Regions:
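Short coil/turn segments at alpha/beta junctions that flank glycine-rich nucleotide-binding fingerprints
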Residues: 101, 118-121
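Acetyl-CoA-dependent GNAT
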Residues: 5, 9-97, 105-114, 149-151, ...
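Intrinsically disordered, low-complexity regions enriched in Ser/Pro/Gly/Gln/His and often acidic
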Residues: 19, 58, 119, 136-138
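Short polybasic/polar patches that bind polyanions
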Residues: 99, 116, 139
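Short acidic-aromatic loop segments in the C-terminal HATPase_c
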Residues: 93, 143-144
Length: 166
């Protein structure tokens, strides 16, 4: 029997699980858009080191979470303060075998709650314009496109979403 998904703050020991979940989500949802699996863009070891460096910098202005199921990390989220009143959801990735389990909603909820607890009034995020699945998810969760766009360093155009935190 599969256990339910639980969410907790990320810690240094989560590095390998964090990177595996991130890579699985990337390869399922973004590789078809970008044209490359994540492993071709950065080594596993480099991504682990980057995660560990980020965790060491977590504070009220930046935090991360993992979603676990059956003692395995299946999803990740990270937010950082963008300005005095705005937080940015920098990452929300769930491995495809955990899609539909509520992991994404739970991770998003943890990030939004932390932003509220830190006095932020608004949240923003960037998502690939062609990432229809992610865009539908964010729209269902109350996010709206604000008209801003940018060229991602990997090629695809990204659009910005916003939502209030009240």
């Amino acid at each position: 029997m599969t256990k339910s998904v639980t969410v907790r703050e990320a810690r240094l020991g989560d590095a390998h699980g964090f990177v595996r979940a991130y890579e699985a989500a990337w390869d399922a949802s973004l590789a078809p858009i970008v044209g490359k699996p994540l492993g071709e863009l950065a080594s596993f070891e480099a991504r682990v080191a980057r995660f560990q460096a980020a965790v060491e910098q977590f504070s009220a202005n930046a935090k991360g979470w993992v979603a676990e199921r059956d003692d395995e990390v299946v999803g990740v989220a990270v937010y950082a303060r963008e300005s005095e009143t705005t937080g940015e959801l920098r990452a929300l990735y769930v491995a495809p075998d955990a899609w539909g389990t509520g992991a994404a909603q739970a991770l998003l909820g943890a990030a939004l709650d932390a932003m509220r607890e830190n006095g932020l009034e608004e949240a923003l995020l960037w998502v690939g314009e062609a990432n229809a699945r992610a865009r539908r998810f964010y729209e269902r969760e109350g996010w709206s496109v604000d008209g801003a766009g940018r060229q991602s360093t990997l090629g695809p155009v990204e659009v910005r979403y916003r939502r209030t935190l009240s």
